[in-house]
Protein backbone atom coordinates (compact mmCIF):
# COMPACT_ATOMS: atom_id res chain seq x y z
CA UNK A 1 0.00 0.00 0.00
CA UNK A 2 1.55 3.33 -1.00
CA UNK A 3 1.50 6.63 0.92
CA UNK A 4 -1.45 8.05 -1.09
CA UNK A 5 -3.55 5.02 -0.16
CA UNK A 6 -2.61 5.35 3.50
CA UNK A 7 -3.40 9.08 3.43
CA UNK A 8 -6.81 8.38 1.86
CA UNK A 9 -7.68 5.85 4.54
CA UNK A 10 -6.61 8.26 7.27
CA UNK A 11 -8.79 11.05 5.88
CA UNK A 12 -12.11 9.29 5.48
CA UNK A 13 -13.38 6.47 7.64
CA UNK A 14 -16.03 5.44 5.10
CA UNK A 15 -13.51 4.65 2.34
CA UNK A 16 -12.63 1.21 3.74
CA UNK A 17 -16.32 0.23 4.02
CA UNK A 18 -16.99 1.42 0.47
CA UNK A 19 -13.98 -0.50 -0.84
CA UNK A 20 -15.38 -3.73 0.66
CA UNK A 21 -18.51 -3.43 -1.49
CA UNK A 22 -16.76 -2.62 -4.78
CA UNK A 23 -15.77 -5.58 -6.93
CA UNK A 24 -12.25 -5.80 -8.39
CA UNK A 25 -11.83 -4.56 -11.98
CA UNK A 26 -15.31 -3.05 -12.03
CA UNK A 27 -16.32 0.33 -13.44
CA UNK A 28 -17.03 3.07 -10.89
CA UNK A 29 -18.55 6.55 -11.07
CA UNK A 30 -17.83 8.68 -7.98
CA UNK A 31 -20.33 11.54 -7.81
CA UNK A 32 -18.87 14.51 -5.98
CA UNK A 33 -15.44 12.88 -5.96
CA UNK A 34 -13.60 15.77 -4.28
CA UNK A 35 -9.85 15.32 -4.66
CA UNK A 36 -10.21 11.82 -6.13
CA UNK A 37 -8.87 10.00 -3.06
CA UNK A 38 -11.56 7.30 -3.12
CA UNK A 39 -11.09 6.59 -6.82
CA UNK A 40 -7.32 6.55 -6.37
CA UNK A 41 -7.69 4.04 -3.53
CA UNK A 42 -10.09 1.85 -5.52
CA UNK A 43 -7.82 1.99 -8.55
CA UNK A 44 -4.75 0.95 -6.57
CA UNK A 45 -6.37 -1.75 -4.46
CA UNK A 46 -9.06 -3.13 -6.76
CA UNK A 47 -7.90 -2.10 -10.24
CA UNK A 48 -11.23 -0.41 -10.95
CA UNK A 49 -11.77 1.79 -13.97
CA UNK A 50 -13.07 4.92 -12.31
CA UNK A 51 -14.44 8.29 -13.25
CA UNK A 52 -15.29 11.18 -10.98
CA UNK A 53 -17.70 14.07 -11.23
CA UNK A 54 -16.62 17.20 -9.35
CA UNK A 55 -17.63 20.86 -9.55
CA UNK A 56 -14.84 22.39 -7.47
CA UNK A 57 -11.79 23.63 -9.40
CA UNK A 58 -9.35 22.56 -6.67
CA UNK A 59 -10.90 19.08 -6.57
CA UNK A 60 -10.65 18.70 -10.34
CA UNK A 61 -6.99 19.78 -10.26
CA UNK A 62 -6.23 17.36 -7.40
CA UNK A 63 -7.86 14.52 -9.38
CA UNK A 64 -5.78 15.34 -12.44
CA UNK A 65 -2.61 15.39 -10.34
CA UNK A 66 -3.47 11.92 -9.00
CA UNK A 67 -4.21 10.59 -12.48
CA UNK A 68 -7.92 10.19 -11.68
CA UNK A 69 -10.33 10.60 -14.60
CA UNK A 70 -12.60 13.51 -13.72
CA UNK A 71 -15.35 15.51 -15.39
CA UNK A 72 -16.03 18.99 -14.07
CA UNK A 73 -19.78 19.24 -13.75
CA UNK A 74 -22.50 20.29 -11.33
CA UNK A 75 -24.42 17.21 -10.16
CA UNK A 76 -27.53 19.37 -9.92
CA UNK A 77 -27.53 19.39 -13.75
CA UNK A 78 -28.04 15.62 -13.82
CA UNK A 79 -26.08 12.82 -15.44
CA UNK A 80 -27.28 13.07 -19.03
CA UNK A 81 -23.72 12.35 -20.18
CA UNK A 82 -24.19 8.72 -19.21
CA UNK A 83 -26.45 5.98 -20.55
CA UNK A 84 -28.44 3.65 -18.30
CA UNK A 85 -26.27 1.11 -16.46
CA UNK A 86 -23.04 2.72 -17.67
CA UNK A 87 -21.18 1.72 -14.51
CA UNK A 88 -21.03 -1.31 -12.24
CA UNK A 89 -21.03 1.01 -9.21
CA UNK A 90 -22.17 4.61 -8.76
CA UNK A 91 -21.01 6.14 -5.48
CA UNK A 92 -22.29 9.13 -3.52
CA UNK A 93 -19.70 9.33 -0.75
CA UNK A 94 -20.43 12.13 1.73
CA UNK A 95 -22.13 14.02 -1.12
CA UNK A 96 -25.85 13.53 -0.53
CA UNK A 97 -26.09 16.16 2.21
CA UNK A 98 -24.44 18.79 -0.02
CA UNK A 99 -26.93 18.73 -2.89
CA UNK A 100 -30.27 20.47 -3.32
CA UNK A 101 -32.09 18.05 -5.64
CA UNK A 102 -31.58 14.96 -3.53
CA UNK A 103 -34.31 12.72 -4.97
CA UNK A 104 -33.49 13.61 -8.58
CA UNK A 105 -29.80 12.89 -8.12
CA UNK A 106 -30.50 9.59 -6.36
CA UNK A 107 -32.75 8.56 -9.28
CA UNK A 108 -29.95 9.46 -11.71
CA UNK A 109 -27.44 7.52 -9.60
CA UNK A 110 -29.67 4.44 -9.75
CA UNK A 111 -30.09 4.91 -13.49
CA UNK A 112 -26.38 5.05 -14.37
CA UNK A 113 -25.09 2.49 -11.86
CA UNK A 114 -26.01 -1.17 -11.68
CA UNK A 115 -25.37 -0.87 -7.95
CA UNK A 116 -25.14 2.25 -5.79
CA UNK A 117 -23.18 2.97 -2.66
CA UNK A 118 -24.24 5.95 -0.55
CA UNK A 119 -22.50 7.29 2.56
CA UNK A 120 -23.53 10.30 4.62
CA UNK A 121 -23.14 11.74 8.11
CA UNK A 122 -25.98 10.60 10.33
CA UNK A 123 -27.51 13.66 11.96
CA UNK A 124 -29.53 11.27 14.16
CA UNK A 125 -26.39 10.09 15.96
CA UNK A 126 -26.94 10.62 19.70
CA UNK A 127 -23.99 13.01 20.16
CA UNK A 128 -25.28 15.18 17.31
CA UNK A 129 -28.72 15.23 18.95
CA UNK A 130 -27.15 16.19 22.26
CA UNK A 131 -25.34 19.13 20.63
CA UNK A 132 -28.63 20.42 19.20
CA UNK A 133 -30.36 19.99 22.58
CA UNK A 134 -27.57 22.09 24.10
CA UNK A 135 -28.30 24.81 21.56
CA UNK A 136 -25.38 24.18 19.20
CA UNK A 137 -25.06 22.66 15.76
CA UNK A 138 -23.02 19.44 15.95
CA UNK A 139 -19.32 19.44 15.12
CA UNK A 140 -17.58 16.06 14.98
CA UNK A 141 -15.22 14.00 12.84
CA UNK A 142 -18.07 13.29 10.43
CA UNK A 143 -19.38 16.88 10.63
CA UNK A 144 -16.19 18.93 10.89
CA UNK A 145 -17.67 22.31 9.92
CA UNK A 146 -19.26 25.11 11.89
CA UNK A 147 -22.83 26.04 10.95
CA UNK A 148 -21.65 29.12 9.01
CA UNK A 149 -19.10 27.43 6.75
CA UNK A 150 -20.56 23.98 6.12
CA UNK A 151 -21.07 22.71 2.58
CA UNK A 152 -24.07 20.75 3.86
CA UNK A 153 -27.48 21.97 2.71
CA UNK A 154 -29.41 18.93 4.01
CA UNK A 155 -29.50 17.08 7.28
CA UNK A 156 -30.60 13.48 7.27
CA UNK A 157 -30.67 10.39 9.42
CA UNK A 158 -30.39 6.74 8.53
CA UNK A 159 -34.15 6.36 8.93
CA UNK A 160 -34.73 9.36 6.64
CA UNK A 161 -32.64 7.72 3.94
CA UNK A 162 -34.38 4.37 4.41
CA UNK A 163 -37.76 6.08 3.95
CA UNK A 164 -36.66 7.88 0.76
CA UNK A 165 -34.85 4.92 -0.82
CA UNK A 166 -37.91 3.09 -2.24
CA UNK A 167 -39.30 6.35 -3.65
CA UNK A 168 -36.18 6.83 -5.79
CA UNK A 169 -35.74 3.20 -6.84
CA UNK A 170 -33.18 2.11 -4.26
CA UNK A 171 -33.41 -1.30 -2.64
CA UNK A 172 -31.06 -1.33 0.34
CA UNK A 173 -29.12 -4.60 0.25
CA UNK A 174 -26.62 -3.92 3.01
CA UNK A 175 -25.64 -1.20 5.43
CA UNK A 176 -22.89 -0.37 7.84
CA UNK A 177 -22.96 2.23 10.60
CA UNK A 178 -19.54 3.64 11.47
CA UNK A 179 -18.33 5.45 14.56
CA UNK A 180 -14.73 6.67 14.50
CA UNK A 181 -14.14 4.36 11.54
CA UNK A 182 -15.37 1.25 13.33
CA UNK A 183 -18.52 -0.66 12.48
CA UNK A 184 -21.16 -0.57 15.20
CA UNK A 185 -24.39 -2.49 15.59
CA UNK A 186 -27.36 -0.72 14.01
CA UNK A 187 -29.14 0.26 17.24
CA UNK A 188 -26.13 1.10 19.42
CA UNK A 189 -25.16 4.60 18.37
CA UNK A 190 -27.46 5.64 15.59
CA UNK A 191 -31.10 6.14 14.74
Explain the meaning of each model-derived region.
Residues 1-11:
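Class I SAM-dependent methyltransferase Rossmann-like catalytic core
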Amino acid sequence: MNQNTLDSLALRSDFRAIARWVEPRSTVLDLGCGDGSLLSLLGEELEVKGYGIEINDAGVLACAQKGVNVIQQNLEDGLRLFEDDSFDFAILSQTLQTIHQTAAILRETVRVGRECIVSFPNFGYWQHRLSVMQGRMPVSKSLPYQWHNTPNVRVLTIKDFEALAPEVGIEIQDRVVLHDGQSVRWGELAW
